[in-house]
Amino acid sequence: MRSPQLSCSASEGRAVEAALSVEHAGGRSMLRRQHVGYPLHVTRGFYLDAARPDLLTLYLQSASGGLYAGDRIGLDLSVARGAAFHLTTQSATVVRDGRGRGAVQRLAVNVEAGAFCAVTSDPYVLFPGAELALASEATVADDAVLCMADGFAVHDPHARGRSFTEFSSRLRIRRPDGRLLLQDAGRISGEDLQGALGRFAAAANLVLIAPPDRLPPVKELQQAADRCGALAGASAAPNESGLVLRVLASDGGTLSCAMEAAFHVAAAGALGVALARRRK
């Protein structure tokens, strides 16, 4: 493993660019390139699914206790032809006070022909003053599958009535020829939270890009999240490219349960088999 260039100071935040490359070889998907540095850490690879022994699962961890003011974190992920890969987080990521600079997390994903890629994050926990911007871009081959999930939950550890500053998310998904399939963007401030979400304090999205015959029933995806006590709504993605699920929950634990359940429905539809539980 090589560590990328990193700048790190309490006043400026940290800037790091990381990369992961997954290929299929010898009947398994394998991590061919790993370029990761502090504060990110990637576990060893796991093969958790007897029904899909080729599927590689990695856990992405934060070694620093969360995201801090001024952090600029980037990750480039490539999943080669025929590979199957799931990148998830070990636990929720705490987002600290942005102090007027906030944190930015960038993700770029390339999924080649016949490949399966899932990138599912536990909710970002927004502490008072937190400001986080997510910027994600993906390129997905016509017969490939991409599942992406992320969201946030609000937490005021000292119960002083303080809220986060802002959470924003932008996602663009294209075909290899550059054709835009989907563009999704949202922004919410702590001041507007109650007006926008009502009694809910956590929200997330799941996007599944897949050929039509590899999509689960919309109702099944929605009901999986609802059974956890969340409020979910699913619909077709633009350009007949897949499905989009929106989820609201009262807290981060309920949201995590709902998103995990929805992921397993999405993965079963895309792969044709049920995946094992990802222990955290």
UniProtKB/Swiss-Prot annotation:
Domain of life: Bacteria
Keyword Ion transport in annotation: no
Record carries keyword Acetylation: no
Cell location: Cytoplasm
GO molecular function: nickel cation binding
Keywords: Chaperone, Cytoplasm, Nickel insertion
Function: Required for maturation of urease via the functional incorporation of the urease nickel metallocenter.
Assembly notes: UreD, UreF and UreG form a complex that acts as a GTP-hydrolysis-dependent molecular chaperone, activating the urease apoprotein by helping to assemble the nickel containing metallocenter of UreC. The UreE protein probably delivers the nickel.
Entry similarity comment: Belongs to the UreD family.
The protein's name in its UniProt record: Urease accessory protein UreD 1
Gene this chain is encoded by: ureD1
